[in-house]
Every structure is written in structure tokens, then in C-alpha cells.
A protein has these predicted regions:
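Rossmann-fold cofactor-recognition segment
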Residues: 1-8
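Substrate-binding pocket helix/loop in short-chain dehydrogenase/reductase
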Residues: 40-50, 147
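Conserved NAD(P)H cofactor-binding loop of Rossmann-fold oxidoreductase domains
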Residues: 32-38, 185
């Protein structure tokens, strides 16, 4: 879904996805899209917060309402959170707020789907080598190195590593309701 703030775009995508789900034995519904802005609690405008929540929270709810009832047993609803789903850093107010909300959505999803044969989890990547992170860091190699040095492997996480964890989470319902941190042993301050 290109524009998760557009109800029409979400509805059109759900219609296409519903037909694909119809013949599937198992589906991994992965909520990965997010907006990340540089903002703070004392300066984040309500309209800006509303836009972030529309993409990062409300769109997920809309998709879940449409698609969860169609998911066969052995399916999963996987939320891609962040290390910021359970903590906070300065300058990411709306993102942190939305990731905490996604964690609550995952936990509620776990409770609401009891006995359905479908499971959920939240995958919380650390600093991953993505366009979103590089943009947030100002495409500054020195800042990127400083961030990479904040984990025990002194590197950014590769997107393929997160993709593999998502695939694993889909095939292992034993983790239902779990928060899976994938941060290479991020240094705490």
C-alpha cells in the first residue's frame, strides 16, 4: 500500500489481498510501513502527530479489520516495531508514540485471537540499514558509524536479517504474543 493515510488506497489494497488470501493455506500479514519524523513532545504539532498515527496505527487497524477475519489457521499477524516500541530517545516523539501503540495492538491482537490458530508477535529491529534511518541521521557517515558502534557487532543490521526473523516468526507460533528484539545487542546508556 503506497499511501497508508488514504482510506481508499487501503481499501483497494485489501480487496486485492483478500482475493490472494482466499486460496492460501497460511498467510503472514506483516505490518511494516511507518513514518518517522524529527519532533519533540514540546513541539510536535497535533496535525503532524495525527498524520504519523494515521500511517503507523490507524492504517494497521483498518487492514486488520478487513483481513484478519479472512486469515486461515496457521497464519500470523506480525508487527514490525522498533527498539523504540519499549523505550524512547529524544527527537522522535511521534514515532516513539506510534511504536508504543503498535506494541499495545500486538498484545491485544494476541488476546483477541486466542483459540483461532493464528498468532502474532512484534519484531523490534535495532539500527537497520534503511533509507528511513539514513534520512533520519541526515545521511551523515560519521553519525552512521557512531550509531553502528552502539551494538556489540559495531555495524548496522541488514534488512535481510530482519526479513529472515519475520519469516521465522511466521513459522513458529510458539512466540505468540512475544516481542522479539533484533538489535545485535544494543548498548544501553
Amino acid at each position: 500500500i503506497r499511501d497508508r493515510s488514504s482510506g481508499t488506497a487501503i481499501e483497494q489494497a485489501c480487496t486485492v489481498l483478500a482475493s490472494a488470501i482466499d486460496n492460501a493455506e497460511s498467510v503472514a500479514l506483516v505490518h511494516n510501513a511507518s513514518q518517522m519524523r524529527k519532533d519533540a513532545a514540546d513541539s510536535c504539532g497535533s496535525d503532524s502527530l495525527r498524520e504519523v498515527l494515521e500511517t503507523n496505527v490507524v492504517a494497521i487497524n483498518t487492514i486488520n479489520q478487513r483481513l484478519i477475519p479472512l486469515l486461515p489457521r496457521d497464519s500470523s499477524i506480525l508487527y514490525v516495531g522498533s527498539t523504540l516500541a519499549e523505550k524512547a530517545v529524544p527527537g522522535s516523539f511521534s514515532y516513539v508514540t506510534s511504536k508504543h501503540a503498535q506494541l499495545g495492538m500486538m498484545r491485544a491482537t494476541c488476546q483477541d485471537l486466542m483459540g483461532t490458530g493464528r498468532h502474532t508477535a512484534m519484531i523490534c529491529p535495532g539500527f537497520t540499514d534503511t533509507e528511513m534511518l539514513r534520512t533520519h541521521l541526515g545521511n551523515d557517515p560519521a553519525v552512521e558509524k557512531m550509531i553502528a558502534d552502539m551494538n556489540s557487532f559495531k555495524r548496522l543490521i541488514e534488512p535481510a536479517e530482519i526479513a529472515e526473523l519475520i519469516r521465522w516468526a511466521h513459522h513458529n507460533p510458539v512466540i505468540n504474543g512475544a516481542v522479539l528484539h533484533a538489535n545485535l545487542g544494543q548498548k544501553e546508556s
